[in-house]
Amino acid sequence: MGFKCGIVGLPNVGKSTLFNALTETAAAQAANYPFCTIEPNVGEVAVPDPRLDKLAEIAKSGQIIPTRLTFVDIAGLVRGASKGEGLGNQFLATIREVDAVAHVVRCFEDSDITHVEGKIAPLADIETIETELMLADLDSLEKRVDNLTKKAKGNDKDAKEQLDLVNRALVLLREGRPARFLERKPEEERAFGMLGLLTSKPVLYVCNVEEAASAKGNKFSEAVAEHARKEGAVAVTISAKIESEIATLSREERVDFLETLGLEEAGLDRLIRAGYQLLDLITYFTVGPKEARAWTIHRGTKAPAAAGVIHTDFEKGFIRAETIAYADYVAFGGEAGARDAGKLRLEGKEYVVADGDVMHFRFNN
C-alpha cells in the first residue's frame, strides 16, 4: 500500500535540496534555476519508529523492515500555472496523483539565491500556490456543471448529489478558500474524493530556514506556523541545507552533529512523521525471529483489511488476529510472556486495529 506526499513550492525555495536529503540521493538537480525539476522525482523513505527497534530487540529478530512513505518532488510552480505558465500543466497533473502536499516555504534570506517574486514573503508565497491550485479546481468544477445539471434534470440521483457537492465547493473556492475546508457528511467522502480537487489534499507547511535558525526558527517561520494554526494544519521548521549535510553522515556522526546544533533529532524525522500523521496513517507490527516489520494502514482499518496489506489471501481467508498491544509486548518481554499474562487477544473481523498492535493473522488458504 503506497502513500505519496508531494513536495511543492515556488522555484528556489529549497524543495529539491530537501528531497535530496530525504532520499539521501542527488537524484534531483538542486541547482539555482527555476525549472531544474522538470520530471517529478520519486523517493521512498523509512518512517522512523523506535518501537520497531525495541520489538526486534526483544524478539531477537534477524531483520528490521520499517514502513515507508513516498515523497514526490514536483516541478516548481509559478504564478499563472493554472493557465499552463511555466511548467504548470505538468505540475497540476502530478499533484493530482499524491495523497497529501508538503508545501516548502522559503524562510531564509540569501542574496546569492534569487526569489522568483523578488522578495522573501512566505505568506505571499503560500497564497500564490494556493491561488493557482484553487483556480485549477474552479476550472475543473465549472466544466462539470452543465453535464451534471442535465443529468440531474433527468432524475439521476447520483448526479443530483454530485451537483450539490460541486456547487458547494464552487462557493467555497470563489470565496478564496481551499476545497479541503468544505463541510461534508461521511457519506459524501467518496464522491468528494472522486472530484480529484487539488485543494482537497491535506497540507503540511515546511519552513526552510537558514542554518542558524534550524533549532528555534525565525520571524518568517513563526508567521507560517501561525498561519498553519489558524488553518488547523501543521508546520515543521527545518534547514534543508543542514539536512542535506546530515544525510551524508553515519548514525554516530549524526548524533554528534545534531548536538552541536542544539537539535534533538533531524528535521527530516519530524517531517516524515508529520507526513505520516497528515495522511492519518498508523502502524501495526509483525514480529518474529526472522524479522520485525512495520505495516502502514489508515486509522480506522479493520483487521481483515489490515491483513490484506501483507497479502490479499490473508484478507480473503481471514479467521482471526492474535493481537498484543505494543506496551504489553514490551512489559512482558515478548509474545510468550504476554500470552502467559493473558495479554494476547483473539480479535475477529470487526476489530479496528490500534496503532502499535503486534499482530499474527490466522487465515484459510
Regions found by a protein language model. Name each.
Residues M1-T114, E142-K143:
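Conserved G1/Walker A P-loop phosphate-binding module
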Residues G2-V8, V13, F19, E142, ...:
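C-terminal-of-GTPase-core extension/linker across diverse P-loop GTPases
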Residues G6, F35, P40-G43, P50-L52, ...:
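Short capping/connector residues at structural and topological boundaries
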Residues G14-N20, P48-K60, G88-D112, D125-L135, ...:
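Phosphate-binding glycine-rich loops and adjacent basic patches that engage nucleotide phosphates
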Residues L22, G84-L87, V116-K119, N218-E222, ...:
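Short, glycine/charged-enriched secondary-structure capping and boundary segments
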Residues A26-P34, N41-G43, R51-K54, K83, ...:
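Glycine-rich, flexible loop/turn motifs
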Residues F35, D49-L52, I65-F71, E85-D99, ...:
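Amphipathic alpha-helical transducer elements in NTP-driven molecular machines
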Residues G43-P48, A75-E85, R96-D158, L172-K185, ...:
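Conserved Switch II/interswitch segment of TRAFAC-class P-loop GTPases
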